[in-house]
Amino acid sequence: MKMVLLIGLALISLCSYGQKNDSWKVVLNNLEIVYSNFSNELRHTRTVSIAEIKKPGFLEIHYFTHNAHFNWFKRLLVFDENDNQVYTIGFNNSTRLPNSFLKSLFTKTKKLVIYALVEPSDINKTHIIKQKRSHLCTLVLNE
């Protein structure tokens, strides 16, 4: 019985050790386009058509954090092809951007780069911890 308990505790600790990375899912019009736990701009670039953007629907971002980041503040950052920030919004674990809003952003640029910024909810810790934006996905408009 003790051996089973020790093996169980070892497995639990190994599982929790392996779950250090945050992960995210990006969904466009109820279709999952990215699910990942690491930033890779080339791999997470998706082409979207004007017809997809004209449909009624949403771009949904679901961000899953490990326990250490559970109560941290998250921001979604949207940049254009020239690395100019065009939109930002704070969110808890998920957020939705309507296709009509994406369409208005795509009138100004043909490429949207979406990042997440995770920072401590305690403002006194923000200067201690290096904040880095994580690339979630890139949307390129195909005309």
Briefly describe each language-model feature range:
Residues Q19-E143:
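Terminal leader/tail segments of proteins
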